[in-house]
Amino acid sequence: MTSAWLAFWNGSHSIYVSARHKDVHYRLIAKAMAALVPRPHARVLDYGCGEALHADAVAAAAGELLLCEAAPRVRAGLAARFANDPKIRAVAPEEVERLPDHSLDLVVLHSVAQYLKPEETAALFALFHRLLKSDGLLVVSDVLSPHVGAATDAAALLRFAAANGFFIAAVAGLARTLLSDYWRLRSRLGLTRYSEAAILEKLAAAGFNPQCADKNIGHNQARAAYYARPR
């Protein structure tokens, strides 16, 4: 991840239009992740987890949950928020690299690939292949395809907002976004996008048997999710 994106996520931002938006966003992700946990004693890694407000729901279904976040301020917040949950540990990316081989049952990379260079994503896939057990699962979700633009994302947010009681805040938030640091960064740096064929090829090159999932994790079904198992 470029230093500009890391600084953005480590600072104060308005990517969520309201507290309600942030809450239902993370709740939806946690519910989907919990459903993917294969067994009660599973070791799970959420890589690039953000604030993960409802990570306790995932941990309740697992034996251990590692929350990996590169932004130091966010990582400190995670450690404080879940300090009393013995199943949850906030870790830095370099700590993940030191984990034992074949020690994880589930790895989730949600809404991260668009902020990484292709070679960074390839390196992560190789790392996850090393860390996953032979029957483990990698989930790469919220992947942007080349044809999904900002208008599609905005429409998905408005539908999500209307269904969850923050529509007016979403309209105002979208207007603010056009003047925000996020939009300036997105316009300057762009977002990394993958066709289905491209992401499947990248996963296969890292040693996985990948497939496109029927449904994306999160509210935006114009984006895609992929399941991959080590071969």
Residue ranges and their predicted role:
Residues 41-50:
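Conserved class I S-adenosyl-L-methionine
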Residues 111-112:
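Short catalytic micro-motifs in class I SAM-dependent methyltransferases
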Residues 42, 63, 105:
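Conserved acidic residues
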Residues 1-37, 51-86, 92-98, 139-231:
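Class I (Rossmann-like) S-adenosyl-L-methionine-dependent methyltransferase catalytic domain
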Residues 122-134:
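A short glycine-rich, Lys/Arg-flanked "PGG" loop and its adjoining helix->strand segment in the class I
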Residues 117-118:
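Helix-capping/helix-break motifs at membrane-protein junctions
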Residues 108:
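A conserved beta-strand element that flanks and buttresses the S-adenosyl-L-methionine
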